[in-house]
Regions:
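Soluble, non-transmembrane catalytic domains of enzymes that act on hydrophobic metabolites at membranes
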Residues: 1-24, 81-85, 179-192, 196, ...
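A cross-family acyltransferase "interaction/gating" segment
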Residues: 127-129, 175-260
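Long, non-transmembrane cytosolic or organellar matrix-exposed soluble domains/tails
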Residues: 237-317
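A transmembrane-helix-recognition feature enriched in membrane-embedded lipid enzymes
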Residues: 22-83, 130-135
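Hydrophobic/aromatic ligand-binding patch that stacks against planar heteroaromatic rings
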Residues: 107-108, 131, 157, 195-197
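Catalytic core of membrane glycerolipid acyltransferases/transacylases, capturing the structured
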Residues: 46-60, 76-77, 93-145
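Residue-level preference for the first positions of well-ordered beta-strands
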Residues: 92-94, 137, 162-168, 203, ...
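Compositionally biased, charge-rich terminal segments
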Residues: 2-45, 215-224
């Protein structure tokens, strides 16, 4: 990995409070329902604290099942419905997703309990930070860009060892709404972590995360965590929202050649996530997209990375 500039892992978006829903824009649940959700969330946080202690001693299959179950249960406690479309490959892979909210972490872990790459600040988040550390999250110190090559090597080693890894290569959250071109983080998908997939010979699987309000049938930024917004304010919006749905769409895997350019690989993944052409996206000559398969019932030996069978899995809140 080449030397990096001081702003490589300090990306920023153009989002501000205007990107968040206006008062009354998103249907809400009554106050008693919000209180019940908060009680449920508190229960899941307590369970998560206990789980963080157990994770290091659990065998890998049980550890992955526990993390997946906790992530799904916590999303349900917040009143969020999770919809999963597609199926992950059976090989260990680098999972890359767009970044809108802190809920993205729960959504990804609910699909596949992978090792995450996250900013150092996540370590201080209540319970989620403890779980992240216990699950082997690779924390990125964005104030020390010269440490990035070592971080990429850690991700490469994890992939070579057969452990899937998930990363949000935009490096920051943004609204990703229609007409939000000015909000897009400068540089789009950062290419550094894609080098790990190339070096490890691992496929790259783009994940598309989208939030919508089932009541209105439209996309919403109610769950977004943007700009000067605080984690508590963002959580309060989620707890109050009526029928909030997060969908995780698993796109076709990209199989980079050994001599692939990480920048082109990043552009190709970004194009798959945002469903629009990105300047400089790689061609089939250097990347080999393989359509994802859908099965009715996987064999008993299906690796832990593979999520529940079926074209669409709807986990109702």
């Amino acid at each position: 990995v080449t030397a990096v500039s001081d702003d490589l892992w300090r990306p920023s978006s153009g989002c501000d409070e205007e990107c968040l829903p206006a008062a009354g824009e998103v249907p809400t649940v009554p106050v008693p329902r919000r209180v019940l959700r908060l009680v449920a969330v508190a229960g899941m946080l307590l369970a998560g604290a206990g789980l963080a202690v157990l994770l290091p001693v659990l065998p890998a299959p049980e550890r992955q099942a526990a993390v997946r179950g906790w992530a799904r249960g916590t999303a349900r406690a917040f009143g969020v419905r999770l919809v999963i479309r597609g199926r992950l490959p059976r090989r260990r892979a680098l999972l890359v997703a767009n970044h809108v909210s802190w809920l993205d972490i729960l959504a990804v872990l609910a699909v596949a309990p992978t090792r995450m790459v996250a900013k150092r600040e996540v370590r201080s988040w209540p319970v989620l930070g403890l779980l992240a550390a216990a699950a082997g999250t690779v924390f990125v110190d964005r104030s020390r860009p010269r440490a990035l090559p070592a971080t990429v090597r850690r991700v490469t080693d994890a992939l070579r060892a057969g452990r899937p890894v998930a990363v949000f290569p935009e490096g920051t959250t943004w609204c990703a709404g229609d007409g939000a071109a000015d909000c897009r983080p400068g540089g789009g998908f950062r290419p550094a972590m894609f080098q790990a997939a190339i070096d490890a010979g691992s496929p790259v699987v783009p994940l598309r995360l989208a939030y919508r309000c089932e009541v209105t049938g439209t996309a919403t930024t109610a769950a977004a965590f943007l700009g000067a917004d605080t984690l508590l304010r963002s959580m309060a919006r989620v707890v109050a929202a009526r029928e909030l749905v997060v969908s995780v769409t698993i796109a076709a895997a990209l199989h980079p050649a050994r001599d692939a350019d990480r920048r082109l690989l990043a552009r190709a993944a970004e194009s798959a996530v945002h469903l629009r052409p990105v300047a400089g996206a790689a061609t089939r000559g250097r990347l080999h997209p393989v359509p994802t398969l859908t099965v009715v019932a996987p064999p008993a030996s299906t690796p832990a990375l593979t999520p529940d069978a079926g074209r669409e899995l709807d986990l109702a809140a």
